Design a protein with these regions (language model features):
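N-proximal low-complexity "stem/linker" segments adjacent to membrane-targeting elements
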Residues: 1-28, 34-35
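Conserved sequence signature across two-component system core domains
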Residues: 12, 42-44, 71
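Acidic helix N-cap motif at the loop->helix transition within catalytic regions
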Residues: 17-21, 48-57
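Conserved donor nucleotide-binding strand/loop of the catalytic core
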Residues: 37-40, 51-87
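A conserved acidic beta->alpha catalytic loop
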Residues: 43-51, 100
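Acceptor/aglycone-binding surface of glycosyltransferases and processive sugar-polymer synthases
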Residues: 69-87, 92, 104-186, 213-230, ...
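Catalytic donor-sugar/metal-binding loop of nucleotide-sugar-dependent glycosyltransferases
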Residues: 157-158, 180-184, 193-211
Length: 239
């Protein structure tokens, strides 16, 4: 498609079943589209042997495609991105989950969208156009929709999906946003979009289908929901 290179940051924790599948899908769809890329696996000391699987994948696909940058323990999503950016050789960075909830088939669409509008950030959205969520029960859908609706009213971010974590950034833009954010956990993704608006960065959107994880347990719990509410109040008061 171009001489651009895309560094895909994959923070992992207990994803030994999912990592081989997401890696295969990434290589399939990006190679078919002629996209130059690398996958940077940032494993935070997974006790299930995720890193061992990542090493096997590196042996299969090569060190240029699979870059391993593990850490000793869980240190948070924001610091995982900072760690990954330091090792990224692409001029664009893609962030996504390793649990198969984000399908790599949407990445070429995100790249095309970025080129069309010369956007600083392109976000995959579940809440616009043909986007949607599959595999969630009604309660979780209501919580997610409700949180997004309240956030839209309070923060007016200029994007339809604030809590999603499937995005394409210019590398320098992601670096500045990550360094400016103070939130932890799920609020971090929301703050990234709010700060992007604050700094005057342009945001494009591509509708995506979000699928609940197939293997492993969801990391969303009561403490994350409380943290989300606190983070929303903080951002409303400070932006």
């Amino acid at each position: 498609m171009s001489e651009d290179k895309y560094s895909i940051l994959l923070p992992t924790y207990n994803e030994r079943e999912n990592l081989p599948v997401i890696t295969w899908l990434l290589c399939k769809y990006l190679d078919e589209a002629g996209i130059k890329f690398e996958i940077i696996v940032i494993d935070d000391g997974s006790p299930d042997g995720t890193l061992d699987i990542a090493k096997q994948l590196q042996g299969i696909y090569g060190e240029e495609k699979i870059v391993l940058r593990p850490r000793a323990k869980k240190l948070g999503l924001g610091t995982a991105y900072i760690h990954g950016i330091k090792h990224a050789t692409g001029n664009y960075v893609i962030i996504m989950d390793a649990d198969l909830s984000h399908h790599p088939k949407f990445i070429p669409e995100m790249i095309v969208k970025q080129k069309e509008g010369n956007y600083d950030l392109v976000s995959g959205t579940r809440y616009s156009g043909s986007g949607g969520v599959f595999g969630w029960d009604l309660k979780r859908k209501i919580i997610s929709r409700g949180a997004n609706y309240v956030t839209q009213i309070l923060l007016r971010p200029g994007a339809s999906d604030l809590t999603g974590s499937f995005r394409l950034y210019r590398k320098d833009v992601l670096q500045k946003l990550v360094e400016s954010c103070v939130s932890k956990g799920y609020v971090f993704q929301m703050e990234m979009v709010v700060r992007a608006r604050q700094f005057g960065y342009t945001i494009g959107e591509v509708p995506i289908s979000f699928v609940d994880r197939v293997y492993g347990e969801s990391k969303l719990g009561g403490s994350e929901i409380i943290g989300f509410v606190k983070g929303l109040v903080y951002l409303f008061a400070t932006t």
